[in-house]
């Protein structure tokens, strides 16, 4: 075989190791084949779909280990695919990642998808890159709402699923019932007969085995899963391999060395570095023309520069400055854009403002509206589920997304980068239909809870204008409650639910549709304690205020007038002085100088604070602190604007 044909595979003669080929052909022998033995590698593209915490990323780690992507002596971090700090801390996958393994002479490109509906914008894009999907389901929990969200998208684009029942060793496993639930789910999502005839595997991603029988054998590792992928998933459906180059951008990232890097599957033709390309928008308009500086292919968890890529392979290209997600990257001779997957609209919005508190600029180094604007628009470039709008005054920005989790992750990321900003309470995106009726987003909510706590859950959900559609036992003295509830009623309910159920409830949400406005929902029952002066909080003053309600600050913490320092025990706001020191006298008496014992404060996490604040309050976020404050810091301004709001109502 001539060398040029060898390079089409992405291989170069010196890089081929005998260990890899020995592994692929099953001999384990350490030999390097002659050039004539190397064939153009076949390709399979698959996505792994699963709910949060059902073991998707762990399974990918095991696939990488067992297919020889790591050396035997290489130390490998757990959950290799979750490379983002926030992903590791929260235990969720936020960004879609691509990797590849080689099995029996076939390159299997695997895409790890986010399982959370807030990050569904990623999911829809990557489904257009793959030809099959592994639906990973927990043997105890069964298919969950987010599984339904992604599976529905996958079935709609015609993917043929493989169902893998994971965590089969769980003592509360019920794999037979779960298989029936999966079948019912597929049927309810209008799956075709071919899609309903899905193969099933059982196993444990953590222990590194899968088999067609729940009891094993376990000594074959994940080989049955990889073999099934080769049999069941079709080869990439590509256009003309010798035709003009065309590719849809599905993932976007900014690289400090390469600039914009676009990942996608090549639809037709081939591409080489330094080749001229143009970028078409969805309506066929030319966005830019340029040259490809580098082509990167996924090999294991590494990205390797290659000399040529062909139709069907998933690659990343660099060298263009304007092309983005859902655009068509193509040869200059192409005139029509490829059709891209539509993306669901955002449902929640919030305001990002320049931090104008008296403590602004003391803890972060990125505080101006210009750097905040640049950072938000840069985020929106790579995250199509986000929408950014500027206010008229240019000092605040309206950021819309899929849910408060997605926005909280963005705020936490910016905070770690050194930004200081103020953010408002999340608000729901409403719109009017053709008759002028106000419509609001409704979500399907599934809550698994112990039977003894089901009453309080139903009561709290009905207060939030939710309608219960289903109540059924889910095994182990637990019940599954299904509601349709307005999105605005669910903001902040997660922490309250955990308190009501002593941490035993699991809540999952999924966007359902838009329905007519359900009416007002009562908000927070308590008022707040506001500092009336600026300085450092004093333990003596805080001790004397404990009867007024719990504090959310500690002694010695810097405060300013208008900052929230505690939760009032009544429903009105109260201004207090937390700076008042003990009166010093020269008269001594027994027991006067005892140490002050304070009740520990309630610490507000970012997620909790976002949902706790009201419409007239802001959360001040800095790299070191999270502070809560009133929108108007001056007491007279608050009274004046409060009266104006009442008059408008």
Label the model's feature ranges.
Residues 11, 17, 24-25, 30-649:
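Structural and coupling elements of P-loop NTPases
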